[in-house]
Amino acid sequence: MISRITLGASVATPGSVIHRDGRAARWAASNGIAAIFSGAEAAAERLRGLPEWRNARTLKANPDSAQLPVRQRALEDGKTVYMAVPRLAGPEPFFALDPDHLSESPRKAASISGAARSARKVALAELAPVDLVVVGCVAVGEDGARLGKGGGFADLEFALAGAAGLIGPGTVAVTTVHELQLQPAGGIPLAEHDVPVDLVITPDRIIDCRDRRAPRPVAGIRWPELTPEKIAAIPLLAAEWAGRPDR
């Protein structure tokens, strides 16, 4: 994943804060969580109107605040939401939010603190197949190429879920962003492990990238690209690594 991309007169880097005249896109990778952007509610509503949304019963979503409105609407619409525990910490690195068994409102339950109260923590093996993947980003190209916060967790989650058979070639990946986070096609280079998105949703429009996005990486974990420190920091990875016969 690249580490920086120019956005107009500003430069977005993982860990940066961007604020355009106090009126539009703003986000911060503070403690690994991207802050909500102006128009996030409208973007979530636009996503809600798509057939890909209506047909989905199970979502896998990132835990960032920018996509909280998406997670909220999923619960309101009766969808099961699997939300990654930040940094995939612990042996059960996903929250399983069941819309029929929430201890508080969908809005509160969709937050990280609310999920800790309303959801069960589950292992990867306990997840059901995923119908729609929701990811966050700092910037995204009109060709679906995305710039994350630099930790590589979204790509890693996708690889793990793909290897487990929870995500297939036809599973749609979507992000919600502000218009100022958009880059022209070709503006964000992709590494071999980077997962492009199929749909980009802004408060004002829908960009379908499926006919022009790069191919997705082959399902599975790219072990040579992971450092021993990264593997040791994520219990799920450490367990997978320990079970490899060729390690």
Task: List the model feature ranges, each with a label.
Residues A61-L75, K79-V81, R87:
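Extended, H/D-rich, highly charged conserved domains that either
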Residues S3-A35, A43, G49-A56, D77-T80, ...:
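Surface-exposed, charge/polar-rich loops and edge strands
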